[in-house]
Amino acid sequence: MSSCKTTLSEMVGSVTKDRGTINVKARTRSSNVTFKPPVTHDMVRSLFDPTLKKSLLEKCIALAIISNFFICYWVFQRFGLQFTKYFFLVQYLFWRIAYNLGIGLVLHYQSHYETLTNCAKTHAIFSKIPHNKDANSNFSTNSNSFSEKFWNFIRKFCQYEIRSKMPKEYDLFAYPEEINVWLIFRQFVDLILMQDFVTYIIYVYLSIPYSWVQIFNWRSLLGVILILFNIWVKLDAHRVVKDYAWYWGDFFFLEESELIFDGVFNISPHPMYSIGYLGYYGLSLICNDYKVLLVSVFGHYSQFLFLKYVENPHIERTYGDGTDSDSQMNSRIDDLISKENYDYSRPLINMGLSFNNFNKLRFTDYFTIGTVAALMLGAIMNARFINLNYLFITVFVTKLVSWLFISTILYKQSQSKWFTRLFLENGYTQVYSYEQWQFIYNYYLVLTYTLMIIYTGLQIWSNFSNINNSQLIFGLILVALQTWCDKETRLAISDFGWFYGDFFLSNYISTRKLTSQGIYRYLNHPEAVLGVVGVWGTVLMTNFAVTNIILAVLWTLTNFILVKFIETPHVNKIYGKTKRVSGVGKTLLGLKPLRQVSDIVNRIENIIIKSLVDESKNSNGGAELLPKNYQDNKEWNILIQEAMDSVATRLSPYCELKIENEQIETNFVLPTPVTLNWKMPIELYNGDDWIGLYKVIDTRADREKTRVGSGGHWSATSKDSYMNHGLRHKESVTEIKATEKYVQGKVTFDTSLLYFENGIYEFRYHSGNSHKVLLISTPFEISLPVLNTTTPELFEKDLTEFLTKVNVLKDGKFRPLGNKFFGMDSLKQLIKNSIGVELSSEYMRRVNGDAHIISHRAWDIKQTLDSLA
């Protein structure tokens, strides 16, 4: 109902102890005069508690309030129900305007210019009246001036009013004018606020249906719950802020006391103006009259205008804007992105019925707005011909598929920076990838909500005769609530948080701390709670249509899954797994029954976890029963190697196929060549025998015959064989000689014959011009080198040296024609193996294979990804 409750609730809370029991000090706003405020009481006690002294104005106010009921009875008997309703409706509108506009103007001028205080000082309203009146004195009553007579009357009346109201020990002249002005101001506030409340209640009472059937239903039950909750909000708010805030005390003077957040002020921003008006809607539900609901909406909306144009400006001038370094972090990140990337511009964002940050030079903005315009115009022009069943399927499928797409991007981005890598490897920047994501996400929101609006609008239009006006208005209120939630969320976390910036630009985060400002002070995940209430509002607007219920469930589930299983794990990874209790959670846990339930749940959870841990320990104990050798990886590998050697060669003493230095080296790092020694009995040797190189995983199925092609990775055993294949075999066959019993030789597989893929390989010796296997070598490993990535210069040096040895570098540019086995994919794999990043083939072709550009680009990507880790 009043201001400083918002002032202190939003900015610093308020004292929770009674003013009379603690030593509260106050000071005037301009002169800084300190004083101890007197004990005051709340509005209801001041007016109706018979044990308290009553001033003349308080008695008049109480009589005016009570007279409303007699007037209501008389007007009802004389003019009937409808006239009486409108009579009190007009009264309510008058007092509501007097509240929001009248009190608003008074407080506005008091806040800016201390108008009431200066007026009291100028006319000495709270100064002592001398007994010997001087003709030149301000207190002279000899003058016939109406002005002086008027101010003399005001002076006497105000002093009499305060003396009759306050205890005898209250010294009127010992206090500064500010406190006395405030005490008089309270009287007029009591009149306006009580009249506003009583006339509204009478109007509502006259609007309640006479039929018991219309009263006793689910709407009335929900209405009573809202009213009871509203009463608790009012009582708890007054418990926290006391009279000082209830009557806008900080417009007159400032209290110096310990200020804390408590109770209802942990549940909602501006609780007296937000959830403090839920009783209005509870009464509207009981009445089931859309006219009452519209009046309630008017009263509530005018209160928000009062908050926006009177209280909030005063709050910011008196206490600051309430933001700290943590709450401004995301905003600073947005500024930093714009500063470091001259071609970056703020993304287009849809907020309700408007678009923010429209860029006339950005095509995607036209595309987004054009999509909305096309869908809306198409729906309006073809409303009669649209099949609602098909439209429902379209909305459902569009929402589900687009959500899966969005969720997949976020999940893969969180796990491996997939989306950023996709753009980096194609030559774009990290920020450019973020810009594309911003378009995708905003377009997803715009498209799905536009389709939902169209479908709901057509549902209402096609079945308007069955739509309940109250339900329609309540639905619009829920839509407005979701729109407000979105705006508050964006205000709290800025564009960076709205577009999941910590998924894409975590290297821009300087402080690993989640914001607890704005709406996040009350809810940990407002988008999961209030971010779908507008969709449920469409259920009300369409009179609980089954299709709208299905869509609302879909929206709710997808929102919940995204927050629970993608956003929350990522937030824990970036900011640490800290348990942050929301304001609502603190308040609920402060209630003793709920706190007891929470303790029971925690104890049960601890018991379950302990039992699972004990069971896990028992099951792990079975591993000790295994032989120790089987737990030793090195010995296990030796056993596997011996088993493979046992089938690698024939029993003949002259059958041999061995890799040189295989006892020393089983892992060949490219471009190191692999030399093979072979021996074959002379009676088995054929001049067309050949040796092929294969991946073990491809040939493991058959040890007698090779059933896969060598892909060119083969060599003859004799220089004179396979002459039609050019000089390749003359270079690979380095030695061959024959004796009476056997033939032996050496074959070297260099970069012109080797694979450029990491893996386990083997050589196979084939008989004649066939694929019959005579000998199989010991498996060995081929791996790409790990280049030096300490600096971009060293990385470029190692890369160019390797490409030169592989014969694919010419004039500093990659030319795969020099080696048919080392193509674009091999180069990509080499870079990925060395530096952990991948460049696309398209990008490398775009830069014409320039080794300098490729190496430096890969190194830059590595630095970017490292900064995101």
UniProtKB/Swiss-Prot annotation:
Instruction: List residues, modification N-acetylserine.
Output: S2
Which Gene3D superfamilies does this UniProt record tie to the protein? Answer: 1.20.120.1630, 2.60.40.2840
Q: Does the keyword Lipid biosynthesis apply?
A: yes
User: Which PROSITE patterns does its entry note?
Assistant: SAM_CHO2 (PS51598)
Pfam families recorded for this chain? PEMT (PF04191)
Q: What Gene Ontology terms describe what this protein does at the molecular function level?
A: phosphatidylethanolamine N-methyltransferase activity
From which residue to which does any coiled coil extend? none
EC numbers, comma separated: 2.1.1.17
Record's protein name: Phosphatidylethanolamine N-methyltransferase
